[in-house]
């Protein structure tokens, strides 16, 4: 998520690369005296500077945001992930039915605190049958399991850690086959685990490699009846090796040792294979393994896809529902859509109040569509068959209506442009 700069035009990875190059140039060109002083060794006394003081200024958003959304139709509750670090990452639980209000609504329950180990929680899946909630954290590379009744600063009942690469984005529970599906962005991968996993369990299957077409995968949905996997892709692509990114000590395949106690077999960084592809939805066989090609792809200018994120399926029409972050819209595609095809309907416009929608879910019991709108701190509820520029039926807010947009998400670097007197921050 990049400020409210147009995300599809300014890629965070590209901005980070520019900032890195700028920093190197400054260090080598502008401050040669620093380098000489360091080389002087004994000639220059070294001191440790401890900055134990509050900041002079703080640029931060203290309000929670909604990143992912999942609904327990039986209990009438909606679970939403807040990945905003400045407000304290959390999982917030609300009733699905409430009187319309513009006031900030307090959750029924909140899972948050150091014992939860949820980090930058990006995805949620529910199993009402087993009373379990599954959450993934992008920064920690963990899959946590909580009771659906959990509240407060509670540790997960189970945790899968040390196997999953960092930068996870989406999680889906295929209840029919008792399997969890997880997407990982930077290594372009889908991993499948047993729902009843134990710590350090290996994935049952992975989808990863140059043939897959995965390019910065985010949202994931499994149609257990058609035996198909749907994945949304932002389009940031590089060649990957099947199995790359697993954190398994000396047997690991990785391109960096960052964050690994035992880096394993480090693959070469260059030459670069990276490129920007159009955003897409790729579809695979549910049982695919290794480096398979997708069975079909939705991609092209007519699709209107622009940073597609959360994905689900309409249980009545079978349509595929996409949270289209880049242009503040919700797109609906036919179940078997393929190629450069337009959506069958679109939810978009000022009346919708959507700003940076990232999560979608359907409440089957009430025929309602829920949308997590990241930028403006709201979750909006619409009729399931909504189309066009339509106002939501009701809204959950975590900030006043006139609060500034959330803008900043996962900050990867910071630089100062002295010429323009501006701070550059890629998210």
Question: What do the predicted segments below correspond to?
Answer:
Residues 71-73, 80-87, 126-128, 133-141, ...:
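Conserved beta-strand positions in repeat-built beta-propeller and related beta-rich domains
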Residues 61-74, 114-130, 162-179, 211-225, ...:
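Beta-rich, blade/repeat-based domains predominating
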Residues 87-93, 142-145, 189-193, 239-245, ...:
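Structural motif
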Residues 2-49, 256-269, 274-277:
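Sequence/structural signature of beta-propeller modules
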Residues 40-63, 104-108, 291-296, 344:
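A short helix->beta-strand "capping" segment at the edge of beta-propeller domains
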Residues 94-102, 145-153, 192-200, 283-291, ...:
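Short loop/turn segments immediately following beta-strands, especially the blade-tip
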Residues 232-276, 382:
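Short, conserved, GDST-rich strand-edge loop motifs in beta-rich repeat architectures
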């Amino acid at each position: 998520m990049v400020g409210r700069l147009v995300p599809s035009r300014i890629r965070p990875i590209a901005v980070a690369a520019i900032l890195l190059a700028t920093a190197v140039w400054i260090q080598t060109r502008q401050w040669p005296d620093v380098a000489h002083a360091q080389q002087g060794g004994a000639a220059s006394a070294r001191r440790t500077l401890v900055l134990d003081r509050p900041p002079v200024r703080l640029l931060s958003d203290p309000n929670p945001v909604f990143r992912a959304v999942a609904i327990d139709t039986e209990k009438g509750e909606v679970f939403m992930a807040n990945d905003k670090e400045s407000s304290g990452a959390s999982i917030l639980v609300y009733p699905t039915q409430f009187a319309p209000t513009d006031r900030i609504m307090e959750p029924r329950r909140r899972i948050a605190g150091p014992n939860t180990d949820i980090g930058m929680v990006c995805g949620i899946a529910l199993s009402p049958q087993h009373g379990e909630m599954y959450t993934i954290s992008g920064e920690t590379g963990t899959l946590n399991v909580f009771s659906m009744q959990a509240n407060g600063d509670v540790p997960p009942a189970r945790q899968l850690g040390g196997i999953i690469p960092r930068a996870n984005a989406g999680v889906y529970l295929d209840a029919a086959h008792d399997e969890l599906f997880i997407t990982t962005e930077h290594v372009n991968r889908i991993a499948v685990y047993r729902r009843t996993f134990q710590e350090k369990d290996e994935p049952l299957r992975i989808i990863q490699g140059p043939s897959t077409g995965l390019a910065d995968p985010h949202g994931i949905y499994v149609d257990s009846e058609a035996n198909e996997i749907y994945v949304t892709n932002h389009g940031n692509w590089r060649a990957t090796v099947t199995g790359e990114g697993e954190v398994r000590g000396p047997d690991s395949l990785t391109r960096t040792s960052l964050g690994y106690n035992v880096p394993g077999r480090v693959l070469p960084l260059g030459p670069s294979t990276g490129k920007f592809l159009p955003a897409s939805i790729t579809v695979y066989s549910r049982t695919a393994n290794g480096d398979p090609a997708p069975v079909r792809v939705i991609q092209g200018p007519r699709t209107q896809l622009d940073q597609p994120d959360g994905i689900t399926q309409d249980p009545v029409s079978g349509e595929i529902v996409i949270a289209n972050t880049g242009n503040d819209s919700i797109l609906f595609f036919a179940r078997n859509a393929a190629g450069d095809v337009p959506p069958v309907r679109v939810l978009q416009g000022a009346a919708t109040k959507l700003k940076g929608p990232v999560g979608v879910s359907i409440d089957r019991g009430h025929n309602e569509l829920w949308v997590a709108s990241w930028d403006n701190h709201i979750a909006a509820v619409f009729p399931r068959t909504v189309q066009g520029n339509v106002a939501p039926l009701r809204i959950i807010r975590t900030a006043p209506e006139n609060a500034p947009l959330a803008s900043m998400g996962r900050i990867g670097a910071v630089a100062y442009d002295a010429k323009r007197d501006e701070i550059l921050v890629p998210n």
